Every structure is written in structure tokens, then in C-alpha cells.
């Protein structure tokens, strides 16, 4: 029948009538296309855009005529409603426009060289998308769907909530990752990019907009201009502009403009643009020209200059810092054994012993009457909300807890409204469970404000072995937050570490809940009201065109030159931005792109500042990867792709859009300027006749020995080099055993090698150096370092000459040694940003205002035996030539260690510049303190050389090498830090005292002039009175 019988559909028989609307929609005959005759000119061929597939011909779309658009009932931009698409796209099935696909590469804000101050400035969008549903946000947050229904003995899953029972890890690029160790920051804790962010505690505070203090730090109390207006597309807007001048590294003056653009969206555009990046024009830039370049979508005609009232800066502070709060409140519910409902927990009158033990660990029980610190809406005068409460502080935050058993109890009231009035309005609630309690279900709590529940169950309470387990339940529109729970949610010992973990979890939960739909809408309304008030009541009649310029024009009327090449703009301290597609792992090999599937790549915004490198997913606005620029080890690149190695050798792949080599060249130039990394080398190592590769490598991947006259030596492998990738896989992913097995058994070994530094030492990241410094033996109780009496290892000149070297002007550090950084032919030929030399040679080095003290004291410290990995000569047989080269290594060591003191030069120069106005005695006292600091540097640096024994036996030297060196690098670093900080504090204190003294002198002079004027006036009046009275006149003047 189906092959062509009477009832076959192929015979054209009409289908049976049906009431199904979807079936009718599918059976409608296709409308024939309209082809009217038009006489429109043929459109010019534009640039062809590559589609998602490389196959097939790509043609530019032909615009339809107005008549065709007028007679067509379908949108021309809407794709054809094919049956396949109708079944796969429910919106097309209902006749609705489909969702627009996301671009392959996320768009980047103009202007190109605007340096963003923080992460949320990278996410600023002139046309923000409407917020999606809670499920959409949750899908983007990377949380597994099955986690929403996971249950345990602590927590029951519920619709609309996401459960965290332990082992989820931190959300990163490509999925969950292990939590970072200090000094690295979690992704959610990264905020400010222009300034260094350090992790001083085990648990970091996340989801905090620390960039909100940008106006207070760089605008408030300084000369700047504010403009307010009502834009037709953006609504009320507020713009702040300020011109800055700072001394460049070459001695000239650099001008830049700090800009803040506020709209009704919660993300604010904050950053800096150099004057050299602006179009050529007069020597002074008008606010209109500046905003036309920085904010091209903002209508300049709607802006008016803000009033000079002191209310305006204060209101802008309140507007920007409404997301910053250092006073937090939370609720604590007490659940006895066998309880689980909301009414049962609210009706517990007295606290048990296990609950009191938990409260004592968490904070301090304070008397409310007369309490002067943060009270969290509790009555501190009449005890109407109870007599006591729980209060504590953590990381500069004041936290007041609303404890259910400490709030007033109302008999014969099952709901306990006096208690629920406080706890029900808290965003974060801690549910304490005694052993034997029922699992907590978040749907039993009826509240619109409670978004996060931290369930804590005690085990063996009131014993020396008390421990706790933790589970978390949050609403779907609340993003994930740390610290991450361990597998199974614990157990946690009852100590200070558990207290810090729980308080950090509570603070981060409240910050994360601010991104939920309800609180986001409330914050948006508040922000809109502030902006509306400023644009309506705090403006003058001065338009943007009539506003004064930032700089006074010179008499010569010299115009600003044409903007320099982008190489002069990559020096900005803020984050420059590129649109990339990122994936974990390395994919570029020997200049060829071997990218994997597209679904493994994530569209991201790449931001590189002078301190931090971040990848931000613009779809859900979270950081998926971050690392300090001092942790960048190396990079391998091709025309459109770049592999970045960081930390212990981990790698990520970045794919960039644009002209071949242009965007990649910009990123490489930026990395050369802000990091200590270099380009890698791809080596193919054949085996000799005996199947050997001809080199030795340790467990960390450092080359310890290369045999002479082997293929490894011929290809350029040297001791001190570092293996980053073996046969296409990174070393951290392989592990030492697998990498060794692959090196022994692979028929052809292809490796990615990181060359040693200029002094021949292995390159390590800052995180590795930090961990090595913690592992060094303590100096306390150890012998004092022995001074070398031979005179052959005098590495540095005396302290006076070192101080003179640090303070004198030097445009560039000493030249590199024999091992120079290698560059491929691709960068020389295709990089349009440099001609004849790399951008790192053209652009001056960024001044480091916060010197890396750890890197100053030791360039590349290593574990015992690391120096054995970089012998002074290739020959290890103890020949006379080898001993001769080693004994004459003093000048080489001097040349290698002197550049390491340059990172202190900016800090010492700043201190001396601040002390320039002091008296001669104070100045010499400062110099003596700096000299003592330099003596500490000399002591630590002089012990980095490896002395050779008098017998000249290299084996004896290696034996001495393996013994731990007396002294601790951490103590040297702490001593150096304390000296510098003390010196800076003393200088600041002296400056403050001098300013107060000058103010007192001015006051005395003013009073003296006033008294002198009054005495002259009295003498004049007395003289006039004596004349009128006829008395003999005397000259009283």
C-alpha cells in the first residue's frame, strides 16, 4: 500500500481533515516567491564573510526591493520554515522569530585601545540583552542539571533550587577545575585588573565589584568634569572625565584620560585611554571629541555639565558604591533531632549544648542594649528584639546573625512572626542540624528573600572529636560561589579554619545572590532613580560643546601628531581586550593549526592588563580563567591561534579573528611587555643508533644534561631548558611517569621546549617560586652565612654603587646574554605592529610600582640540585676547560644578577622622590635605611653563586650543591618587605606632619597679618581721635 497503492500519499490523495493546528500548519502549501521587476542598481560586492562551515560558496546577501518587502507577509531576514527546522525549532513552529545565533567571536567595544579598569568594565554593553530565565542562567553557570535533584542525609533536592553536596570544584574553562592554591585567586574573586590583587587568606571573597571604588580613588576630591543627560536609547546617563599627567619611562610626560560612563545597567564602563590613541587634533582635547571617540553610541547633544554643588560628588559616590557593603547580616535556624519543618525550627525556645558550641565557634554573643557596632535592624535600646545576639568580624566585614533562639519567642503563635520578620528577610540562612535531624528541604521555607541555605550538621558534638559536614542549597538564578566543598561535604574539624570557611561561604553566597533576578531588578531601579535625579536636578545650561577643554592650548598652536602605532598603546596599565575562542590544552604544533571540535571552544573576551590575564564569558558574565602575568611562562602562535603556557606548565588555546597575524601579533606584543615569558621552540628529536635521545630530564621537566655531539644538541636543546609538551600533550596532564614512558618508547619524539633565561637558569612562574620559598628550611637556629674570602665570587659592587645604580636613570636594562629569546619568521614578516624590530624593543617597559620582592631576592630559585641541572659547561668530565669556565663566571653572574635589581629601582626611586623635599639629616637617614635594605639584597644574591672547591673537582661541587643552604628566603623577603613598608610609612608620616606644620605656619602668618592690620587700624583711629580732641599728635604708626 505504501509503495504506490490507492491509499498511498504519493498518489496525491488528500489527507484526512484534522483539528490539529500543528498538522494544518505543516500541510499549508508553500507560498511561491515574489519576483517583482525592479530597477535598483546592482549592489557592490563587499567582503565575503566566512560562515560556520568552510565548505560551499559564500555570497553576500542581496537586499530585497521595497515592493517585495511590502507585499511579503514574512520577514525577509527570517530563515525558511523547512519541515526539519519546524520540528527542531519550537519558535519557528509557532510562527515566532527564532533566536539569533551568537557570533563566532564576541564583539569588542570601541575604541580599540581603551584600557579597562576591572572585569565588569570588560562586560559593559551599549545594548545589553534582556536577562534570561533562571534555567537559562543556571545552564550557563556550568552547574550540572542532575545536581538540582541530588539528595543526601543533610539536604533534599527541590525544584527551583540547586544542591551542592561536595566535590563540585570550581567552574573554569572547559568544566569544573580544582580550587587554586595561594597566591592564585579563584575566578569569581577576580575584579580589579589595573592593580595587583593578592590573596592573603586561604578563602577569598567572591562576586565583589571592587572596581566600584574607582571614582573615589581617581576622581573624588580631584579636578574633573561630570556630565549628565537623558539619552533616547540609553535613558539617564552620567559621565565623569579626568585628565591625568604622569612621567613616562623615557623622561617625558604622558597624558591620559580616565573615563566613567554610567547607564541604567549595573555594569559601568571604567578605564583609561592614552592621548596618543586619540585622533590627531589640537593639543587640548574637548570633552565632546573625547566622548565621540570613547562612547560613540552616546548622544553628545543630550549631555549637560553637572553643577558645582558638593552634593553631586557625594551622590556619585553613593551611586557607584551601592554594591559595596562591609556590613552583612544572616540568619541561623536551629533544628533539633527529629525535626525538619520550618515551624518546628522557629518554635525551639532554648538552644542545646551542640548549638551553643557551634555559636561559640562562629562568633561572639554580645549584649544588644548599648551595642554600638553594626546591629542589623536589632533594637539596641529597649531589648524589644531580644537581649543578646551573635556578632563577629571577618576580612574587614561586620556580620550580625539573627539567631532563632535569641529572638523573642511568642507563645501560642505557630509561625513566630517576630522571629521570621528578621530571619525571613536575610538572604543567607545557616541551618544547624543536630545528629538525627531530618534532611532539610528548601521548599519548607516560605520567603522571597532567602536565596541561599547553608546546612551544617554536627557529628560527635561536645566532645574533643567534634566535626561538621556542610551542604548548600541555592536558587537557580544564583550563580555558583566558593569556597568549594570537599567530597562529601566534609568532615570539618571544629577549629578556626572551619569558621573561616563558613563565614567566607556565607559572605560569598550573599554577594552571588545579588545577581539573582529579584535583587538585580531592585538594584537597577535604585540606580535608575539616582541617575534620573542627577540628570534632572543637578545640571547646568552648559552643553558638551561649550564645556572647557582639559588642557590649555599652547601659544604656538602646535597640533597633536598622528597617533602612534598600536605598539605605543599596549603599555597601558589597564586591560586591553580581544575577542577570542578559548579551549583548555595546547593545539598549535610547529606553526600548524590542529584545532579540535568547535563545541570545545568557548567564546570569551580576553583581557590582558599589566598585572592579570583573564578570560570572561560574555554570555553569563563570569570569569572562566585567570592568571597573573608573572605566571605566564611562554607562548606558541600561528596566524590565527596561540597556545599560552602558565603556572606549572598548563596550557590554554586562544583562537583569534581578523587579518592573518594581526590580532595574534597584538596579543604577543602585549605579553612581551607585561610578562617574563618568551616564545617556545618546537623540536623533533630523532634517536641515535642505540635508541637514545641524548638528554636527561627530571620529574619537573627541566633538562639536566645534554650529551655532546648528539641530535638533541644539534637541534638546540640546552641544559636549563624546560619541556612543556611531549608528543602533543602537556606535562601536567601526562604526569612524570607517563611522560618518561613516552620519551623512552615513542619512535619519534616531538617536544615543545621553553628556553632558559638570559643567565642560563630554568624559567619558573611566580607561583612555583612562591611554593619553593615556602619549602625552604627555616633560618632560625641555623649557622650564619659564611663570607667568601677568595674574592672570586664578588658578584655585586659595594652597597653605595648598587644604590647609585638603582637610583640613576637608565633607559634600558643591560643587554641579554648568550641565550637570546628566539622569534619565528612569521612574527618578523606578518606582524604589522613592528617594522624591523619587535614591539617590546620599541615600547618602553611598564613601570612596576609594586616590585616583586620574591623575584628580586632570587631570580629563579630551585629545589636542591637544580643548579646541578644547569652546569656551567656541556662537558661534565671535569676537564681543565670546564674548571676554567666555571672559575671565570664572575662577570657573567654579575651581568645576570644586576638586571634583577631593576625591579627595585622604581620603588626606591619613588621613595627617594618623596623624600626629596626633606632636610639633609632626614634624607641621609632614609639613605642609610635603604643601604641596610640593599645589604640584605646583597647577602641573598651573593649566596646564589655556586663556589667550586679548591681541588677543582666538579663532583665535589655537585655534592655541595645538593646540601641545603643555610638561611631562609622567606625570612629575607619578609625582612625586605618590612623595611620597605616601614620606610614608606615613615615618609608618609613625615609628609603628613610637614603638611600639618605648614598649615599651622600659614595660620600663624594669617593671624599675624590680621593683627598687624588691626594695629594699624587702631593707630589710625587713635590719631584721628587725638586730632579731633586737639591733643598733641604723636607718630603712632
Swiss-Prot record:
GO terms for molecular function: GTPase activator activity. InterPro entries: PDZ, PDZ_sf, Rap/Ran-GAP_sf, Rap/Ran_GAP_dom, Rap1_Ran_GAP. PROSITE patterns: PDZ (PS50106), RAPGAP (PS50085). The keyword Transmembrane does not apply. The keyword Nucleus applies. GO terms for cellular component: endomembrane system; membrane; nucleus; perinuclear region of cytoplasm. Gene3D superfamilies: 2.30.42.10, 6.10.140.210, Rap/Ran-GAP (3.40.50.11210). GO terms for biological process: regulation of cell cycle; regulation of small GTPase mediated signal transduction. It holds the Pfam family Rap-GAP_dimer. This is Signal-induced proliferation-associated protein 1. The lineage of its organism: Eukaryota, Metazoa, Chordata, Craniata, Vertebrata.
Amino acid at each position: 500500500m505504501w509503495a504506490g497503492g490507492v491509499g498511498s500519499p504519493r498518489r496525491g490523495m488528500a489527507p484526512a481533515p484534522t483539528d490539529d493546528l500543528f498538522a494544518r500548519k505543516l500541510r499549508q502549501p508553500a507560498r511561491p516567491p515574489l519576483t517583482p521587476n525592479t530597477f535598483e542598481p546592482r549592489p557592490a560586492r563587499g567582503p565575503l564573510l566566512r560562515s560556520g562551515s568552510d565548505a560551499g560558496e559564500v555570497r553576500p546577501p542581496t537586499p530585497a526591493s521595497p515592493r517585495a518587502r511590502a507585499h511579503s507577509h514574512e520577514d525577509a531576514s527570517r530563515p525558511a520554515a523547512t519541515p526539519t527546522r519546524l520540528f527542531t525549532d519550537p519558535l519557528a513552529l509557532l510562527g515566532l522569530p527564532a533566536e539569533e545565533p551568537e557570533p563566532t567571536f564576541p564583539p569588542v567595544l570601541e575604541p580599540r585601545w581603551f584600557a579597562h579598569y576591572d572585569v565588569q568594565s570588560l562586560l559593559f554593553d551599549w545594548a545589553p540583552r534582556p536577562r534570561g530565565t533562571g534555567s537559562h542562567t543556571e545552564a550557563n553557570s556550568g552547574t550540572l542539571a542532575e545536581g538540582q535533584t541530588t539528595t543526601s542525609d543533610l539536604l533534599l533536592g527541590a525544584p527551583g533550587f540547586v544542591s551542592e553536596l561536595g566535590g563540585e570544584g570550581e567552574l573554569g574553562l572547559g568544566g569544573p577545575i580544582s580550587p587554586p592554591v595561594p597566591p592564585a585567586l579563584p575566578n569569581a574573586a577576580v575584579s580589579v585588573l589595573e592593580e595587583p590583587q593578592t590573596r592573603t587568606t586561604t578563602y577569598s571573597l567572591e562576586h565583589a565589584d571592587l572596581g566600584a571604588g574607582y571614582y573615589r580613588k581617581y576622581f573624588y576630591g580631584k579636578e574633573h568634569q561630570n556630565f549628565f543627560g537623558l539619552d533616547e536609547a540609553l535613558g539617564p546617563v552620567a559621565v565623569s572625565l579626568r585628565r591625568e599627567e604622569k612621567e613616562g619611562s623615557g623622561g617625558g610626560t604622558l597624558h591620559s584620560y580616565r573615563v566613567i560612563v554610567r547607564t541604567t545597567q549595573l555594569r559601568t564602563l571604567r578605564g583609561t585611554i592614552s592621548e596618543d590613541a586619540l585622533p590627531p587634533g589640537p593639543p587640548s582635547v574637548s570633552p565632546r571629541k573625547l566622548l565621540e571617540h570613547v562612547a560613540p553610541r552616546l548622544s553628545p547633544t543630550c549631555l549637560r555639565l553637572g553643577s558645582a554643588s558638593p552634593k553631586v560628588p557625594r551622590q556619585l559616590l553613593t551611586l557607584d558604591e551601592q554594591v559595596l557593603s562591609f556590613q552583612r547580616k544572616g540568619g541561623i535556624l536551629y533544628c533539633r533531632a527529629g525535626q525538619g519543618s520550618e515551624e518546628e525550627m522557629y518554635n525551639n525556645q532554648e538552644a542545646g549544648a551542640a548549638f551553643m558550641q557551634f555559636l561559640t565557634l562562629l562568633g561572639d554573643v554580645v549584649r544588644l542594649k548599648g551595642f554600638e557596632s553594626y546591629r542589623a535592624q536589632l533594637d539596641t535600646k529597649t531589648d524589644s528584639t531580644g537581649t543578646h545576639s551573635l556578632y563577629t568580624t571577618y576580612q574587614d566585614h561586620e556580620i550580625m546573625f539573627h539567631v532563632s533562639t535569641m529572638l523573642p519567642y511568642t507563645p501560642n503563635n505557630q509561625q513566630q512572626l517576630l522571629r521570621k520578620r528578621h530571619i525571613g528577610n536575610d538572604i543567607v540562612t545557616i541551618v544547624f542540624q543536630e545528629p538525627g535531624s531530618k534532611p532539610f528541604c528548601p521548599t519548607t521555607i516560605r520567603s522571597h528573600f532567602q536565596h541561599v541555605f547553608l546546612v551544617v550538621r554536627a557529628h560527635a558534638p561536645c566532645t574533643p572529636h567534634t566535626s561538621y559536614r556542610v551542604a548548600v542549597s541555592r536558587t537557580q538564578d544564583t550563580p555558583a560561589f566558593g569556597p568549594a566543598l570537599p567530597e562529601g561535604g566534609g568532615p570539618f574539624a571544629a577549629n578556626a579554619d572551619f569558621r573561616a570557611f563558613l563565614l567566607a561561604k556565607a559572605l560569598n553566597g550573599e554577594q552571588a545572590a545579588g545577581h539573582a533576578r529579584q535583587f538585580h531588578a531592585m538594584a537597577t531601579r535604585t540606580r535608575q532613580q539616582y541617575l534620573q535625579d542627577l540628570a534632572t536636578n543637578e545640571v547646568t545650561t552648559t552643553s558638551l560643546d561649550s564645556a572647557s577643554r582639559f588642557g590649555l592650548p599652547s601659544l604656538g598652536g602646535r597640533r597633536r601628531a598622528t597617533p602612534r602605532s598600536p605598539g605605543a598603546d599596549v603599555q597601558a596599565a589597564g586591560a586591553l581586550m580581544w575577542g577570542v575562542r578559548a579551549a583548555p590544552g595546547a593545539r598549535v604544533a610547529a606553526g600548524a593549526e590542529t584545532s579540535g571540535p568547535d563545541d570545545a571552544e568557548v567564546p570569551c573576551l580576553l583581557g590582558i592588563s599589566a598585572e592579570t590575564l583573564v578570560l570572561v564569558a560574555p554570555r553569563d558574565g563570569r570569569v572562566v580563567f585567570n592568571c597573573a602575568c608573572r605566571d605566564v611562562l611562554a607562548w606558541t602562535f600561528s596566524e590565527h591561534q596561540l597556545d599560552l603556557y602558565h603556572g606549572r606548565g598548563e596550557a590554554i588555546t586562544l583562537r583569534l579573528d581578523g587579518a592573518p597575524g594581526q590580532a595574534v601579533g597584538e596579543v604577543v606584543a602585549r605579553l612581551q611587555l607585561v610578562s617574563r615569558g618568551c616564545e617556545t621552540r618546537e623540536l623533533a628529536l630523532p634517536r641515535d643508533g642505540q635508541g637514545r635521545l641524548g638528554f636527561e630530564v627530571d620529574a619537573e621537566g627541566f633538562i639536566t644534561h645534554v650529551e655532546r655531539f648528539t641530535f638533541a644538541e644539534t637541534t638546540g636543546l640546552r641544559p636549563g631548558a624546560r619541556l612543556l609538551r611531549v608528543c602533543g600533550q602537556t606535562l601536567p596532564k601526562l604526569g612524570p611517569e607517563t611522560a618518561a614512558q613516552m620519551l623512552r618508547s615513542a619512535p619519534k619524539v616531538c617536544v615543545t621546549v621553553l628556553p632558559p633565561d638570559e643567565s642560563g637558569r630554568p624559567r619558573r612562574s611566580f607561583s612555583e617560586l612562591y611554593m619553593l620559598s615556602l619549602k625552604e628550611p627555616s633560618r632560625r637556629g641555623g649557622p650564619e652565612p659564611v663570607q667568601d674570602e677568595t674574592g672570586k665570587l664578588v658578584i655585586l659592587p659595594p652597597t653605595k654603587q648598587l644604590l647609585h645604580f638603582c637610583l640613576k636613570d637608565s633607559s634600558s636594562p643591560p643587554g641579554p646574554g648568550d641565550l637570546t629569546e628566539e622569534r619565528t619568521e612569521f612574527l618578523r614578516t606578518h606582524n604589522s605592529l613592528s617594522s624591523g624590530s619587535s614591539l617590546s624593543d620599541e615600547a618602553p617597559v611598564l613601570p612596576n610600582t609594586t616590585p616583586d620582592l620574591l623575584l628580586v631576592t632570587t631570580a629563579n630559585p630551585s629545589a636542591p640540585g637544580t643548579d646541578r641541572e644547569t652546569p656551567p659547561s656541556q662537558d661534565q668530565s671535569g676537564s681543565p676547560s670546564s674548571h676554567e669556565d666555571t672559575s671565570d663566571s664572575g662577570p657573567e653572574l654579575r651581568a645576570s644578577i644586576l638586571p634583577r635589581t631593576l625591579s627595585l629601582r622604581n620603588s626606591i626611586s619613588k621613595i627617594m622622590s618623596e623624600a626629596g623635599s626633606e632636610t639633609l639629616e632626614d634624607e641621609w637617614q632614609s639613605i642609610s635605611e635603604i643601604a641596610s635594605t640593599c645589604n640584605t639584597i646583597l647577602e641573598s644574591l651573593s649566596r646564589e653563586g655556586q663556589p667550586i672547591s679548591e681541588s677543582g673537582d666538579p663532583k665535589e661541587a655537585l655534592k655541595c650543591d645538593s646540601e641545603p643552604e643555610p638561611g631562609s628566603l622567606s625570612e629575607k623577603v619578609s625582612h625586605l618587605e618590612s623595611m620597605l613598608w616601614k620606610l614608606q610609612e615613615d615618609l608618609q608620616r613625615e609628609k603628613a606632619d610637614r603638611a600639618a606644620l605648614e598649615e599651622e605656619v600659614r595660620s600663624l602668618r594669617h593671624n599675624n597679618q590680621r593683627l598687624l592690620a588691626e594695629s594699624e587700624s587702631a593707630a589710625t583711629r587713635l590719631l584721628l581721635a587725638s586730632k579731633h580732641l586737639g591733643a598733641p599728635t604723636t607718630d603712632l604708626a
